[in-house]
């Protein structure tokens, strides 16, 4: 069987199982099995493959049809300008979160030797993207998950910035190391009661601990704000990702802790997404 027929068979199976990006996913899964680029597959569709390759491909297609995200199946996710290693231990990087990178780069355009803290570092996509762009910035990432930190370290090595970043296993309440010019965080912000309404791919496979924002959706955001007020230098900046309906509540929490809200930015779907504030 040649590549074209394999892709068609995989696509048809995925379509029957309501996978919207069926053809693209088939190409990506075949790329993973063959260890070649998607472009290579598209340009060589008449190439025949062995039964062993076809069998491996089918197994991945079945997993994808069950809802398992493509990023977990191929072990990588594109974010900002880079490809990040991911497993089921970390949340898959979202395009909406790139807004944080964009705004941080605007904020720090003329800054140097900034110390950055990422609370809940996960795969490292936020912190490491910033450090990759800003060659004289130094970063610290904390997470309660040992596996997440291992993945962040792998991504730091891949990007060649391990010498400018440190990682610590800690929850935010117990972290006391240093003072920072900039703190970033994409904390869990979905109400516990709303988790069941998430897409099948998300609720079935992604880590609940990275999604669950507690009864009111802001329990983790509250912790980040409280601790940031202690860990941040005067006039330091806090950049948070929030849910579309949390603007008012988060502003209240920030004001109580002595932060001035500079601006709230909308994402590409015109939802409130990123809040920037200054510690007074």
PLM regions with names:
Residues 96-197:
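Conserved SAM/SAH cofactor-binding pocket of Class I
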Residues 215-278:
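Conserved Class I SAM-dependent methyltransferase catalytic core
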Residues 29, 67, 97, 126, ...:
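Residue-level signal for inorganic ion chemistry
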Residues 1-57:
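A short N-terminal interaction module
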Residues 189-220:
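Mobile active-site "lid"/loop adjacent to the S-adenosyl-L-methionine
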Residues 93, 118, 141, 213, ...:
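Conserved SAM-binding loop
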Residues 161, 206, 232-234:
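Helix-to-beta-strand junctions that scaffold the AdoMet/dcAdoMet cofactor pocket
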Residues 32-107:
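Conserved AdoMet
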């Amino acid at each position: 069987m040649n590549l074209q027929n394999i892709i068609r068979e995989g696509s048809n199976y995925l379509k029957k199982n309501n996978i919207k990006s069926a053809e693209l996913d088939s190409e990506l899964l075949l790329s993973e099995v063959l260890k070649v680029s998607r472009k290579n597959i598209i340009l060589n569709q008449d190439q025949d493959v062995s039964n062993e390759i076809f069998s491996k491909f089918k197994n991945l297609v079945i997993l994808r049809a069950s809802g398992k995200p493509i990023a977990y199946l191929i072990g990588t996710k594109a974010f900002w300008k880079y490809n990040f290693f991911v497993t089921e231990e970390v949340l898959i990087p979202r395009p909406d979160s790139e807004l944080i990178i964009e705004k941080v780069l605007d904020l720090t355009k003329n800054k140097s030797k900034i110390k950055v803290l990422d609370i809940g570092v996960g795969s490292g996509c936020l912190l490491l993207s910033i450090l990759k762009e800003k060659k004289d910035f130094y970063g610290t990432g904390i997470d309660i998950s040992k596996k997440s930190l291992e993945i962040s370290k792998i991504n730091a090595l891949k990007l060649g910035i391990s010498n400018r970043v440190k990682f610590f296993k800690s929850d935010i309440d117990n972290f006391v190391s240093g003072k920072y010019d900039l703190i970033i965080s994409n904390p869990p912000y979905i109400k516990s009661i709303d988790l069941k309404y998430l897409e099948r791919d998300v609720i079935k496979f992604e880590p609940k601990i990275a999604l669950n924002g507690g009864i009111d959706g802001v329990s983790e955001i509250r912790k980040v704000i409280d601790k940031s007020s202690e860990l941040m230098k005067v006039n330091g900046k806090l950049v948070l990702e929030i849910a579309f309906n949390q603007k008012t509540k988060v502003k209240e929490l920030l004001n109580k802790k002595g932060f001035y809200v500079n601006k709230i930015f909308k994402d590409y779907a015109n939802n409130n997404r990123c809040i920037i504030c200054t510690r007074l």
